A protein has these predicted regions:
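Nucleotide/phosphate-binding catalytic cleft detector across ATP-hydrolyzing
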Residues: 1-42, 60-76, 80-175
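Gly/Ser/Thr-rich loops at beta-strand to alpha-helix junctions
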Residues: 49-51, 140
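Short beta-strand scaffold segments in enzyme catalytic cores
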Residues: 44, 51-56
């Protein structure tokens, strides 16, 4: 059993949080995973109930965003409005809806695509060459994206945790 906590610095990443315990360990592990997959600047996007985006340039965590995931966004819209309904479908292509259910799904999809495009714009303003590390249980929300040379898919939290475990094993064998 391995238990990890967010750290101020590890694996060449310096955390920007003044109080690192306020950062969820899932975000930290996602960055640890991403740093192993990229030797360039990167942003890591973990897509699930919430979508987290964190930016790292030259080993320095610049900060990030936390936004509602697709399901949360859709459910909040349905719960907060009358006569707006949704289905359980997640669009696999980018487009527009032709009935209320599709409009809710494609609208939430477009909002999340806006987060992705904003992340690309932000990191582009900091570094011209960068990688995009994408993972999470709902990463299929971004299935329509063309796979670019600078995009990597990962099981972020598990691979970040595995990186810590390998490091601990190496420490144990060197003593």
């Amino acid at each position: 059993f391995v238990e990890k906590h967010t750290e101020k610095e590890a694996f060449g990443i310096k955390n920007s949080y003044a109080n690192v315990q306020k950062m969820g360990v899932d975000r930290w592990l996602a960055m640890v995973c991403a740093a192993e997959k990229s030797k360039k600047a990167f942003f890591v996007m973990d897509v699930g109930t919430a979508i987290t985006v964190d930016f790292v340039v030259d080993g320095q965590h610049l900060g990030g965003w936390i936004v509602p995931g697709f399901q949360v966004m859709r459910n909040a819209l349905v719960a907060s409005t009358k006569k707006v309904f949704a289905n359980d479908e997640i669009p696999t292509t980018f487009g527009v809806g032709t009935d209320t259910e599709d409009c809710v799904a494609t609208g939430c999809h477009a909002a999340l695509y806006g987060v992705y495009l904003s992340a690309v714009d932000y990191i582009s303003s900091k570094q011209t060459e960068f990688d995009i590390i994408l993972g999470g249980g709902d990463k299929k929300v971004f299935a329509f994206l063309k796979s670019a040379d600078n995009m990597r898919l990962a099981h972020l939290v598990m691979q970040g945790l595995a990186r810590y475990a390998r490091s601990e094993l190496l420490k144990g064998t060197s003593t």
